[in-house]
Amino acid sequence: MNHMSASLKISNSSKFQVSEFILLGFPGIHSWQHWLSLPLALLYLSALAANTLILIIIWQNPSLQQPMYIFLGILCMVDMGLATTIIPKILAIFWFDAKVISLPECFAQIYAIHFFVGMESGILLCMAFDRYVAICHPLRYPSIVTSSLILKATLFMVLRNGLFVTPVPVLAAQRDYCSKNEIEHCLCSNLGVTSLACDDRRPNSICQLVLAWLGMGSDLSLIILSYILILYSVLRLNSAEAAAKALSTCSSHLTLILFFYTIVVVISVTHLTEMKATLIPVLLNVLHNIIPPSLNPTVYALQTKELRAAFQKVLFALTKEIRS
């Protein structure tokens, strides 16, 4: 009640105007949140450690400074940004009861989440293009996927997502929030926040849907097209061994794509079926922002021979240092 009274102001029109939101955490299991914070904290620390280690390994090994691993390094930075955008605040809610978040902070978090998720989708598309050129046009690969192209593609994704995401928090900030300010969530999601608005929130829902289709929808379509062309090229190879080797270079990337976009689709379905305030979609939303940053380095380390060898070398050096 203290949070509620402190975060509502009376305007000249005698309406209660919200000045801050209260994030209640996972719906229906508030008493378990201290226990849930432990795996979340471990996932966050493992995400930071694993992604940082990947970056160091790529930086220190000239043999790994190839387009595929450079894109992986960029993905690692995006993953750390995404995890850091949400997990520290969630842990503050669970450990210190820091449930209050100001409107500017909330809208900034909405922007950051959408930006990093869009960047992840964009980098996955860049990695799909890299695999397409490597398998379908191997002789032209060095002249096509150059350092200049990688830089331009990355800058394009930054600009694209920066522009695409801007309308989402801007429209959310223009809504009239009155009376209710408690959100059954661990983070500021656009649809969760705008569901508290007193005025028409359809522009926000339409905007998010359109931008999602223009951004991640187009990324996924191009990724699918890339893999159709890759599969067509592989099936034309005379050697089964060569075909298997070509497809093996895509296994890590395909694993990330399937996990990332499957959860995106499930979350979208839960929003369309009006399940926004129940435990499952809230939990999925949080996991979608923390599992990929933790999973991506592990997938590549286990499935990529060069990176696995570099990991083993680092672990051997660390073990030797500890024993000495």
Swiss-Prot record:
Segments on the Extracellular side according to the record's topology features: 1-34, 85-108, 170-205, 268-281
Residues of the signal peptide: none
Keywords on record: Cell membrane, Disulfide bond, G-protein coupled receptor, Glycoprotein, Membrane, Olfaction, Receptor, Sensory transduction, Transducer, Transmembrane, Transmembrane helix
Gene Ontology CC terms, in alphabetical order: plasma membrane
The keyword Disulfide bond belongs to this UniProt entry's keyword annotation: yes
A family per Pfam: 7tm_4
Tree of life domain: Eukaryota
Membrane topology per record: Multi-pass membrane protein
GO molecular function: G protein-coupled receptor activity; olfactory receptor activity
Topology, Cytoplasmic side: 56-63, 130-148, 227-246, 303-322
Glycosylated position list: 12
Function: Odorant receptor.
Similarity field: Belongs to the G-protein coupled receptor 1 family.
Protein name: Olfactory receptor 56B1
